[in-house]
Amino acid sequence: MIRLTPASAHGLHGHVTVPGDKSISHRALMFGAIAKGQTVITNFLASDDVLHTMTVFRNLGVAIQQNENSVRIQGQGFDGLTPPKKPLDMGNSGTSTRLLMGLLSKQNFDMSIIGDESLSQRPMTRVMKPLTEMGAKIDLTANGTLPGIIQANATLRGITYDMPVASAQVKSAILLAGIQAEGETCVIEKIASRDHTERMLRQFGGQLESKNGVITLKKQQQLQGQHVDVPADISSAAFFLVAALITPNSELTINRVGINPTRDGILKILTRMGASIEVTPIDTQGEPLADLTVRTQTLHGIDITAADIPSAVDELPIIALAATQADGDTIISGAEELRVKETDRIATVISELSKLGANIEEKPDGMIIHGGQSLTADNDAVLLDSCGDHRIAMMNAIAALITTGDVILTGEDAMSVSYPGFLEDLSEVML
């Protein structure tokens, strides 16, 4: 529990370097573990979720050395994993669970997979369904949740799968199984989801074709270890972008942020709301990077629809906070996915911001945010609950910057899932 005070009249100023991208850090570990030879990961995100992925591979016999934000992996190829001596603990990481269900679905030994209380309530059936069609043998609870077992399996077969809902995790699970499957695997997306898996597969020497929403690949003979320099996470940068926009007299630059076009929904949405964000591209061979500079500006309400969600799903809580300060209403629709995150993020965003006086209506697939609301703590301080959700915790901390009165935040340790040093970095730009 910590007490947070409003920003000073001076506002927020300076440069921020947020940690490495969580999605890319996960995938770099996975590809490094199944590739042949050494993989080096720099600007690695050593957060709780990603460290669970690392521990899983160590328990599968992969030699991994970590020195702060640098990692070396000695990969032994697809068949180089060894039976674990205990259940594979995914912690709170849905990314680890869903992607590894695909990647580990063709091993010659059984694996038990477990997670914490929150993860054990999140649905896994939508991943299991296409993997089962490919020949994977996965057992879950009657509710389609963890704990589960990935059974020993000698053969996978390629399938054509039409994604019913945009999901990078489901798509990636299919592709990670597909690189080990006989025949052709084809994933059809109506709305593009983040493409880090496809980009990284190519970097490690894999081959696939992606055209007009159709991703096609065949069994890969062997991947080769690589150097992966992880960009700063745009999902973490989003909190500082919004903080500068809504905190008076502020100007911040966030350094070396990954601006992958399947992840830059936050930039497009804030721009539509009236933000002017300076994007200074950085030459790079891997994922596109840029420095982002933003100043305090007046925002206006917009409609955020299903087509916007895949490239900004993790940023919707902080977008909701920005919308409370905008002129007019912001309507978020097609965001049912928020119901099955670490918390029901639709309900949790509304419950926490409403404690500060925000006027938000709940919809089955989103929310209606009535803008122009001053945030106020009754009786000089209000208690906000992180609810075990890292993105809710950081949203609450940014809300405290513009709240009249103090915020007492509980569960702030949840931030370590994606951004262990968030409060320290926020304090630096408040000086």
From Swiss-Prot:
Its main location: cytoplasm. It comes from the Bacteria. 3-phosphoshikimate binds at residues 22-23, 27, 167, 169, 314, 341. Phosphoenolpyruvate binds at residues 22, 94, 122, 169, 345, 391. It catalyses: 3-phosphoshikimate + phosphoenolpyruvate = 5-O-(1-carboxyvinyl)-3-phosphoshikimate + phosphate. Pathway: Metabolic intermediate biosynthesis; chorismate biosynthesis; chorismate from D-erythrose 4-phosphate and phosphoenolpyruvate: step 6/7. It is an enzyme of class 2 (transferase). One of its GO terms (molecular function) is 3-phosphoshikimate 1-carboxyvinyltransferase activity. It is found in: Cytoplasm. The keyword Zinc does not apply. Pfam families: EPSP_synthase (PF00275). The active site is at 314 (proton acceptor). InterPro entries: Enolpyruvate_Tfrase_dom, Enolpyruvate_Tfrase_sf, EPSP_synthase, EPSP_synthase_CS, RNA3'P_cycl/enolpyr_Trfase_a/b. This is 3-phosphoshikimate 1-carboxyvinyltransferase. GO terms for cellular component: cytoplasm. NCBIfam families: aroA (TIGR01356).
